[in-house]
Amino acid sequence: MLKQQGSNRIYTRETDENGRSVIRVVGTNRDENRAFIYMARHFHALGLPVPELYWVSEDEMTYTQEDLGDTILFDHLDDYTLLERAMRALAHVQVEGARDFDWSVCFPVPAFDERSIRWDLNYFKYCFLKGTKIEFSEPKLEDEFDTLVQRLTTNDQRLPDTFLYRDFQSRNVMIRDGQPYFIDFQGGRRGPTQYDVASFLWQAKANFSPALREQLIDAYLDELRTLQPSLSEPAWRAALPHFVLLRTLQVLGAYGYRGYFERKPHFLESIPLALKNLHALFEANADLQTQYPYLYAISNDLLLLV
């Protein structure tokens, strides 16, 4: 059985009847499996860098996919060329991958909307913040959650026709022959492109410097402009810190659940890094301090736990 981090799916490497090395995946949720199967086939047919599916069981609970090896981008974070290739490839998955996409198959929701944002914020509150025993005002916290939800859902009146990967981070990027391949995109949905950039560049254990983040954002936007010539870069950049805030809170919720409740060491080890990320985000963005003063105060209190 292959190593997993936060997933309950079972992955094994096998040799199929054609003598190929394949990855067999046994899922726990049919709808989630169905989403991955659809997305993998859709992206592969478009020539996007995802594993090819070879076989799917009748009940869609098990499938085999192309074996991309054992090399993940997380183990090569000092290789700028690979990082840039991954960011540029992401833009293609987000834009080209959304063409003729059936959003109804997405799991658990078809789009990045107010309800799914509140799920993430409550994940932070209940699975992380309450577990720290820090005293806080729920009304004040919820007021700022409302502000963040409004900022993320009213920046554009129409939800963009782009694919939001949801868990785009370096552990979910395989490297083969010097090229990135994407896995674990079954949580994807229709949504804004900034979320995945935030997810990747502010991954806690990646610990990218601000300068490197800016370089990679520039490379990503350079690629995105070729796919979306009408892109407003100032508006895109202005919204990014709010997506970073949401993603960081969501990740802390996940680390709290997987670490505090499931006692998984990797997630416990990541909590101090994520807290430093949260605090650094506020320190680098005076506008965030102004718009979310209570969350900023909480970030200062949480830093004392590190």
Please name every model-derived segment.
Residues 79, 137-141, 238, 263-267, ...:
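Residue-level recognition of alpha-helical structural elements
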Residues 122-131, 194-230, 242-262, 274-281:
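Active-site activation/catalytic loop segments of kinase-like enzymes and analogous catalytic loops
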Residues 36, 79, 83-86, 117, ...:
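Hydrophobic packing residues in well-ordered alpha-helices of helical domains and bundles
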